[in-house]
Amino acid sequence: MVQEKSKIPDAKRIVSSSHLVSEKAAELSEVEYGLIVAWNAFGKWMVKAMATAVAEADISVSGGTDLNVLDILCFHSVNHRARPKKLADICFKLNVDDSHTVNYALKKLIKANLVSSEKHGKEVLYATTDVGIDLCLRYRAVREACLVDGFMPFDGGSGAELGEVARQLRLLSGLYD
């Protein structure tokens, strides 16, 4: 069976590493570059949004140190559904294999009084403090003010098109895991 060559010339492709472009799946290189750019943009946005929420709340985070992307992801994961979480559950949800990095983020969040920990037998459960809940609400307000209006142009506001993109990204993640 002969593989049909893509109709887009390689010179027109937007990729991060031309030496990785495959004749069988050149589009995959384009998707990978899109993921790289989107991930970094999303990370920068999360850090800036959290810094804005922290400034509005007038709290000190970890002695003045800004929260990084993993700290913020862990923070929102702990707050999710207002139920205490185990380290393993947070790692699983975020698809992070290096649990020590998540553990470090949780310690940083505890030091900032955004998250608390409580030992139950051999397990440690993490929960959001009242200060943390307030900060999550402030972050949500920043997110609403900055992103929701920009979201509407994707498909007229129904969200179906972006929902399909999210589904495709979850499927793609299975290829890399």
Predicted regions and their residues:
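N-terminal leader segment of winged-helix/HTH proteins
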Residues: 1-61
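Amphipathic, non-membrane alpha-helical segments in soluble helical-bundle scaffolds
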Residues: 25-36, 99, 129, 159-162
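Generic structural signal for well-ordered, non-transmembrane alpha-helical segments
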Residues: 36, 40, 130-137, 163, ...
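Solvent-exposed, charged/polar functional surfaces in cytosolic regulatory/catalytic domains
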Residues: 41, 45-52, 138, 142, ...
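N-terminal helix-turn-helix DNA-binding core of bacterial DNA-binding proteins
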Residues: 47-97
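Canonical helix-turn-helix DNA-binding module
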Residues: 82-124
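Basic, amphipathic "hinge/linker" alpha-helix immediately C-terminal to the N-terminal HTH DNA-binding motif
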Residues: 121-141
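Terminal interaction helix/tail motif
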Residues: 141-177
